[in-house]
Amino acid sequence: ELSSKSHHSSLHKKAGFDWECYHRLYKFIKKGGYEVVHAHVGSIPYILLSAMLLRKVKFVATIHSEARREAGRNIMKWSRFIMFQHHKCTPVTISDESKVSFDEYYKMDAPMVYNGVPQYSAKCMAPLVDNNDQLLFIHPASCQKVKNQELLIKAFAKLVKDYPNVKMLWLGSNETFKSLYDTLVPDMVSQFKYVGTVPNVRDYLAQADAMCLSSKMEGMPMTIIEAFSVGCPALCTPVGGILNMIEDGKNGMLSASLSVEDYYLMLKRFCKLPSEQKKQMRLQAKESFAKYSIDNTAKGYLEVYK
């Protein structure tokens, strides 16, 4: 939801790369008289013209994942190099892992600001479990290849043979890659439920025993920060900035690799924990949220904007 102080405008970008967006964005920024322009992901190359011509404007770009992959190819890649290395745009990394990859790839130093979310306000919601002894897992991610749902679904199918009283709820859109979703459905056991998009993922995470990510690549997932904010441990693959967020056995767990077998073994390891250890893991997940508060994120970016 947008704050009343925020405004949404569309540049009516065409599908694929849209050369006209360079000029439209330049005119939009110039007319608005903005002091700071902050770009993310696919919008970064489109600020090139504006960054070269509008010298009184501070341009900032957040790098959300591993630098080489995030840069892409051709114009996506060289536009970043031009802006960053000629100091036309300030790059910001979001984790220790992403900073290392950025510094090595671009041969320059970049500031780091952790992602953050506001404190969670508990809401009354019907129980999501079918019985008091059931373990509840939440998978908060849209359906796409990089999120690697195939691994999660197959690993969970193995888990239910050992622990049938478990439940996985998949929260996220399947509309963009509907054909991919259709190929995954046959492997979903009855305890694996697709819910779709929900207004507030944290209402679900607050009831979960753990959240699960099986990604092939990540920067610093907001979903893990959201999980920590409600004291929900994260069970993830060992990729990207996740390695800087999760201490195995403390605020969550990491699989040994990106194989189905290793992810299954991690899930099984969590299920075998005594209830007291699961409770302790929840407390440590909550404690981990401290450095990911939105207040710290805001302070970090205000320093960058100076």
Residue map of PLM features:
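A short, well-ordered alpha-helix in the C-terminal region of glycosyltransferases
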Residues: D262, E276-K291, G300-E303
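Aromatic "clamp/platform" in nucleotide-sugar-dependent glycosyltransferases that forms part
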Residues: T197, K216
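Conserved acidic donor-binding segment of nucleotide-sugar-dependent glycosyltransferases
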Residues: D248-G249, M253-V260, R269-S275
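Short His-centered aromatic/hydrophobic patch
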Residues: A39-Y46, I63
